Amino acid sequence: MTTDTTVFVSGATGFIALHIMNDLLKAGYTVIGSGRSQEKNDGLLKKFNNNPKLSMEIVEDIAAPNAFDEVFKKHGKEIKIVLHTASPFHFETTNFEKDLLTPAVNGTKSILEAIKKYAADTVEKVIVTSSTAALVTPTDMNKGDLVITEESWNKDTWDSCQANAVAAYCGSKKFAEKTAWEFLKENKSSVKFTLSTINPGFVFGPQMFADSLKHGINTSSGIVSELIHSKVGGEFYNYCGPFIDVRDVSKAHLVAIEKPECTGQRLVLSEGLFCCQEIVDILNEEFPQLKGKIATGEPATGPSFLEKNSCKFDNSKTKKLLGFQFYNLKDCIVDTAAQMLEVQNEA
């Protein structure tokens, strides 16, 4: 790709998207982002020092019919790459269909329809930010003998994934991603773009802008924050699963743009498994100001817990395609927590 290429990033104010936009601008791309309001968009432009290669458009509700039409009517002839990062990720709902499933599917559908209507000849690549949640059924997550690969799919149906908020979130990622692959299959003759998906596990790592921590944080980072604020002798839920650093997620999007071998691939981002016990161990070992003030759980039992209680992820195909080393858990958690503590001290 030449660096005069224009990239559209949906959900531009999100945790992952801010890192992606920073990396795109550093690489010389022209970037158009979408945010929900003028206020959010203005705030974002200011954070990037009103970079002349960055502009923002308003998409109030990604689930609304024709949500992205205006953006592509206006910029369709400039945009060559589309990174669809916008998707609901929260568990504070009981109407799973309305708040998680439908918006995720409709958002994907509406951005692809807008490309077909207004940018069928110009958009060359679409990269959808999916999740490992699209690969594994939540009830299988604790099966120690199960191995998940780039070919795996979450087996939940539209109905069965509405059992609880976690299953519904995982279902929303599966059905949004399926929508993208099916759209391309059905519209091959009327669009020219190729499709890839990026499927990260739990995404940790520092915020692009530290002050984002003052306005609520993404769900994965919330796990680290809770453990930083845990009590001595306190119990914590030992979440476990695949993890990745946000800086690697961002880098993977850029590699997917630039490397033809990534076309048509599902890129599974995981640098191994984590559990909260391992995070607590890192916090106690690396931050003297926390030692003796937060929970300790059962130190050093993380690996044996994971062996028994988590399915395994084999993403060797992805690692070979991407060709770069991911952050390990210790560095990722240290950088995440250090930023949180710094912001806390300034408050």
Curated annotation (Swiss-Prot):
Optimum pH is 7.0. Coiled coil: none annotated. Pfam families: Epimerase (PF01370). One of its GO terms (molecular function) is carbonyl reductase (NADPH) activity. GO terms for cellular component: cytoplasm; nucleus. Its EC number is 1.1.1.-. Optimum temperature is 25 degrees Celsius. Its cofactor is NADPH. Disulfide bonds: none annotated. NADP(+) binds at K40, Y169. Keywords: Cytoplasm, NADP, Nucleus, Oxidoreductase. It is found in: Cytoplasm; Nucleus. Induction: By furfural and 5-hydroxymethylfurfural (HMF). It is an enzyme of class 1 (oxidoreductase). NADPH-dependent aldehyde reductase involved in the detoxification of aldehyde inhibitors derived from lignocellulosic biomass conversion. Reduces commonly detected inhibitors in biomass conversion hydrolysates such as furfural, 5-hydroxymethylfurfural (HMF), cinnamic aldehyde, benzaldehyde, phenylacetaldehyde, and anisaldehyde. Belongs to the NAD(P)-dependent epimerase/dehydratase family. Dihydroflavonol-4-reductase subfamily. This is NADPH-dependent aldehyde reductase ARI1. It comes from Saccharomyces cerevisiae (strain ATCC 204508 / S288c) (Baker's yeast). The gene is ARI1.
